[in-house]
């Protein structure tokens, strides 16, 4: 059975941010950004919400509901076929949510800005599936849904680990050069492109 994919409502965007934080909580990248496990889910949820709230203006946020009606999967895409508008009050909002870890988030932004492709594309910023619903094809369904809509427009993403890389390769993404890029503490991300 194919899952029903729908646009997230504006009211759901904080829930999407929290879902991304929960599904990414095991990743070394999140641990690098917020080393304190007691604060990580809150800070990362706020960070993902900050970015997710901007996506409907210049991209899209799609979700899948679980059997109980809660969100179990989400994809956050940005349309980079034209110049993307800045997030209003981004610096102030980032400083407020990141607190003592603000330098880590600045390093992340600098890394991603430096290595982001210039060719027109759609950027898969986040693909998240609730831990209780992973390995059921929901992430792939979300990717397929947008890939079909792109009409041959390329797509880009930053993968976080070997499992992600294998998944994205199955959906037509290839390694870019440079492939791995690193935070100052050597935490890696992996650049991938789908033509």
Please provide the spans of the model-predicted regions.
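Conserved N-terminal entry element of GNAT/NAT acetyltransferase domains
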Residues: 1-14, 22
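Conserved GNAT-fold acetyl-CoA-binding loop/helix
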Residues: 27-49
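A short helix-loop-beta-strand connector motif used in the catalytic cores of GNAT acetyltransferases and
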Residues: 45-63, 117-123
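Conserved beta-hairpin
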Residues: 57-75, 128
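Conserved acyl-donor/pantetheine-binding loop and adjacent beta-alpha core of acyl/acetyltransferases
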Residues: 74-130, 134, 183-186
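Conserved GNAT acetyl-CoA-binding A-motif
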Residues: 120-123, 149-160
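Conserved acetyl-CoA-binding loop-helix of GNAT-fold acetyltransferases
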Residues: 129, 135-148, 170
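Conserved active-site alpha-helix within GNAT-family acetyltransferase domains
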Residues: 140, 152, 161-178, 184-185
């Amino acid at each position: 059975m194919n899952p029903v994919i729908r646009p997230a409502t504006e009211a759901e965007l904080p829930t999407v941010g929290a879902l991304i934080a929960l599904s990414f909580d095991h990743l070394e990248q999140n641990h690098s950004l917020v080393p304190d496990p007691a604060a990580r889910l809150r800070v990362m949820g706020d960070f993902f919400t900050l970015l997710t709230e901007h996506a409907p203006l210049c991209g899209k946020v799609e979700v899948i509901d679980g059997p109980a009606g809660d969100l179990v999967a989400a994809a956050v895409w940005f349309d980079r076929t034209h110049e993307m508008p800045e997030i209003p009050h981004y610096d102030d909002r980032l400083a407020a949510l990141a607190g003592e870890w603000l330098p880590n988030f600045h390093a992340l932004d600098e890394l991603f800005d430096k290595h982001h492709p210039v060719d027109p594309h759609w950027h898969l910023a986040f693909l998240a599936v609730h831990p209780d619903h992973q390995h059921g094809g929901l992430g792939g369904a979300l990717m397929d849904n947008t890939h079909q809509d792109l009409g041959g427009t390329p797509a880009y993403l930053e993968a976080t680990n070997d499992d992600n890389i294998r998944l994205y390769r199955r959906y037509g993404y290839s390694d870019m050069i440079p492939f791995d890029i690193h935070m100052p503490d050597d935490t890696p991300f992996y650049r991938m492109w789908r033509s």
